[in-house]
Design a protein with these regions (language model features):
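N-terminal glycine-rich phosphate/pyrophosphate-binding loop and immediately adjacent elements
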Residues: 2-131
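Conserved acidic residues
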Residues: 4, 256, 269
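Rossmann-like flavin
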Residues: 91-198
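Short beta-strand to alpha-helix junction loop
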Residues: 156-167, 209-230, 240-242
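Residues forming anionic-ligand binding surfaces in small-molecule and nucleic-acid pockets
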Residues: 198-209
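Glycine-rich loop(s) and the adjacent beta-strand/alpha-helix scaffold that form part
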Residues: 214-234, 248-249, 259, 264-304
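A conserved short coil-to-beta-strand element within the FAD-binding core of flavoproteins
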Residues: 241-255
Length: 304
């Protein structure tokens, strides 16, 4: 009998997990509490205009390509991604602006206009960002981290690369001009982070953008959601909207299914949740079934 997998949440992560589970031969059901898929990448319309409610740019397009290739399909048949140039335009209060681009010659020329002595510093910064990328992304993107030792193995490398420093502090070691420091440290703002507190590991984003560019989905991120849900429908994944999960049923330490808000019980061999972890622990899993992550410990967590 084919194993049944339930995915809670139809955001990008949930839809991607559903695709990978289906490619592994599982029967998959995606449960979404809202009335449309997408999660934080949902879209809405107001006065004839369409808005992305969450993310707007894509910096690793090949990850979407992989999902479609699992089924022998071409992502371009579902939605289009176009490179953005410049990646970003940073505008300062004094009227100056900086076009953050992928072309070295154009980028270095702009840096020289702001502060010629920062050209050499930027080149060292790029080298540092690549080293952090090689550890913080290449080695960790597929890491399990189910065991504490898995994470501890890469700590020496991150310490050596000073990734424990704040992003702003790390960039300031190489860049002297305050405006340029802002240009190369704003990325944590995109996920609600503070460049003065976010760890230096975020410097890897700079190399990631140089490596793969910044892309926009024609039609907005809603087009990506439509493409992914179309793919899942074609390969036999069931997507249920307006289906909030009330509780994850745990028996003898193993999740056995979910209880929906309408009283429906769905049995499952595998449960993957793409919902916020704090909500999952405190609202979906009974405290008696949690070896750790008590309500009190979750309440003490700090969020960006």
């Amino acid at each position: 009998m084919t194993e049944h997998a339930i995915v809670i949440g139809a955001g990008f992560g949930g839809l991607a997990a559903a695709a990978r589970l289906r490619a592994m031969g599982r029967r998959v059901t995606v449960l979404e509490a809202g009335n449309q898929p997408g999660g934080r990448a949902r879209a809405f319309e107001r006065e004839g205009f369409h808005f992305d409610a969450g993310p707007t740019v894509i910096t690793a397009p090949h990850l979407f390509d992989e999902l479609f290739e699992l089924f022998g399909k071409d992502r371009r048949d579902y939605f289009d991604l176009v490179p953005v140039d410049p990646f970003y335009r940073v505008v300062f209060p004094d009227g100056r602006h900086f076009d953050y681009v992928g072309d070295d010659e154009r980028l270095l020329a702009q840096i020289a206009e702001f502060n010629p002595s920062d050209v050499a510093g930027y080149q060292r910064l790029v080298s540092h960002s690549k080293r952090i990328f090689d550890v913080g992304y290449t080695q960790l993107v597929d890491a399990d981290f189910s065991r504490f030792g898995d994470m501890m193995r890469i700590v020496p490398d991150l310490v050596r690369l000073r990734a424990y420093k704040s992003l702003y502090g790390l960039v300031s070691e190489y860049i002297q001009d305050d405006a340029l420091r802002q240009v190369f440290t704003f990325q944590p703002l995109l996920i609600g982070g503070n460049p003065f507190r976010a760890p230096g590991i975020y410097l890897l984003i700079h190399w990631l953008e140089r490596k793969w560019g910044v892309h926009f989905a024609m039609g907005g991120t809603a087009a990506i959601v439509r493409g992914l849900t179309r793919l899942l429908d074609e390969v036999g994944v069931e997507l249920r909207l307006n289906a909030p999960v009330e509780r994850i049923e745990v028996v003898n330490g193993r999740a056995k299914g979910v209880l929906l808000a309408d009283g429906t019980f769905l049995g499952s061999d595998i449960i993957v949740s793409n919902a916020d972890p704090a909500m999952v622990y405190t609202r979906l899993i009974d405290s008696s079934a949690r070896r750790k992550h008590s309500d009190a410990s979750v309440a003490r967590k700090r969020y960006s």
